Regions:
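Proteins enriched for Cys/Gly/acidic motifs involved in redox and nucleic-acid/cofactor modification
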Residues: 1-174
């Protein structure tokens, strides 16, 4: 069993939904309840934009490190925006984490779990929202480098998804 922990914005929710479908397709059972984690593997998808969200992500990682040290968790993986931006620092400061992945490393995580031959991220998602709405990502990144914003540092240049892919995802949801 695997615990998937979502930190931060709704953008992360879409990423978690992609992970869930891949885990299901590869035979993993999962849970999203960070208040009652029960899995032997934990994947924490972090936020790295706002100071409070960064701290919450770090606190959550440390809580799961404690579970691992107590023998209640076998493997701990961290991914998402925080680890994309601060991977080297996190690896140095929290060596108990088995592996830090960036924001775009879904296939590498599956490979680490022994499922390298698993499906690709084709946009098919396991929806965790109520049936009447879903988040649809239309782009990633930003080309502006505002002094107060870390989006371009973390996610790179603005890249739009192909229009046909977006429309197909919306059709699949209706």
């Amino acid at each position: 069993t695997m615990d998937l922990i979502k930190m931060g914005c709704s953008n992360i929710l879409g990423e978690i939904e992609l992970l869930i479908i891949q885990f299901e397709d590869n035979g993993y059972h999962w849970g999203l309840d960070s208040q009652r984690p029960q899995g032997e593997i934990a994947v924490i998808n972090t936020c790295g934009f706002i100071e409070d969200a960064k701290q919450e992500s770090i606190d959550t990682i440390l809580e799961f490190v404690q579970r691992k040290q107590e023998g209640r968790l076998k493997k701990l993986y961290v991914m998402g925006c925080l680890s994309q931006r601060y991977q080297k620092e996190l690896e140095k400061e929290i060596p108990e984490v088995d592996k830090f992945y960036g924001k775009f490393n879904y296939k590498q995580l599956l490979g680490e779990l022994g499922k390298a031959d698993g499906p690709s991220c084709d946009g098919h998602r396991h929806l965790t929202t109520p049936r009447h709405y879903a988040y649809v990502k239309i782009a990633e990144g930003c080309d502006r480098h505002c002094a107060y914003c870390a989006i371009p540092i973390i996610t790179g240049k603005h890249v739009s998804r192909p229009k046909a892919e977006i429309l197909q995802e919306v059709r699949d949801r209706v």
